[in-house]
């Protein structure tokens, strides 16, 4: 008989275990049994909650995106100026929960998987559109809409690129350095603007 109220806790444990397992292996070449073992639950329970590896992977991506969105909304809520909003968007993308070694490796794996999975590709497109629209909203208060869109596209590419570089490197991710690079890029692009 399942314990009442345990499902959300077990789901979260499995999602966290999926991030760790995928991050450690650097690929989606993992089994539900390996993820379940990492979470300390039975493979049958993992299948019961998620119905299979693909659904567990998608739930893991959704979790990371939801966490990013919640952190972003909280950070933006504390800003007063467009430049503060831009800084908050950048900082959240390199927060400790997102820019950890295993999470970075998991994100890189999701990008590779998107070439074969329409569901994964759709989630990554949603992420890219949200990042772009959040940046454009703040940037167009400082420059033209056309320039704001181009600057946002460049900043998004830098953020993704820094994830890729850190996924391939042996050193621990340096969030402060990554934030400074993206902020410097935007500052240079805005020189001479309002």
Curated annotation (Swiss-Prot):
SUPFAM superfamilies: Homeodomain-like, Tetracyclin repressor-like, C-terminal domain. Repressor involved in the biosynthesis of the osmoprotectant glycine betaine. It represses transcription of the choline transporter BetT and the genes of BetAB involved in the synthesis of glycine betaine. Signal peptide: none annotated. InterPro entries: BetI_C (IPR039538), DNA-bd_HTH_TetR-type_CS (IPR023772), Homeodomain-like_sf (IPR009057), HTH-type_TetR-like_transc_reg (IPR050109), HTH_TetR (IPR001647), Tet_transcr_reg_TetR-rel_C_sf (IPR036271), Tscrpt_rep_BetI (IPR017757). It holds the Pfam family TetR_N. GO terms for molecular function: DNA-binding transcription factor activity; transcription cis-regulatory region binding. Disulfide bonds: none annotated. This is HTH-type transcriptional regulator BetI. GO terms for biological process: glycine betaine biosynthetic process from choline; negative regulation of DNA-templated transcription. Pathway: Amine and polyamine biosynthesis; betaine biosynthesis via choline pathway [regulation]. Residues 31-50 bind DNA. The keyword DNA-binding applies. Residues 8-68 form the HTH tetR-type domain.
């Amino acid at each position: 008989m399942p314990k009442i109220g345990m499902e959300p806790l077990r789901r979260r444990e499995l999602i966290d275990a999926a991030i760790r397992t995928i991050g450690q292996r650097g690929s989606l070449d993992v089994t539900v049994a390996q993820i379940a073992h990492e979470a300390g639950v039975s493979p049958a329970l993992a299948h019961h909650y998620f119905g299979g590896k693909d659904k567990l992977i998608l739930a893991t991506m959704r979790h990371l995106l939801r966490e990013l969105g919640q952190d972003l909304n909280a950070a933006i809520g504390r800003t007063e100026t467009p430049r503060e909003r831009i800084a908050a968007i950048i900082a959240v993308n390199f927060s400790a929960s997102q820019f950890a070694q295993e999470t970075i490796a998991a994100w890189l794996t999701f990008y590779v998987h998107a070439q074969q999975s329409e569901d994964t590709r759709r989630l990554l497109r949603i992420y890219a559109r949200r990042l772009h629209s959040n940046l454009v909203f703040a940037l167009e208060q400082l420059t033209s809409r056309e320039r704001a869109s181009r600057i946002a596209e460049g900043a998004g590419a830098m953020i993704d690129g820094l994830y890729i570089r850190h996924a391939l490197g042996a050193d621990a991710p340096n969030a402060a350095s990554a934030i400074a690079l993206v902020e410097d890029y935007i500052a240079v692009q805005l020189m001479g603007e309002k």
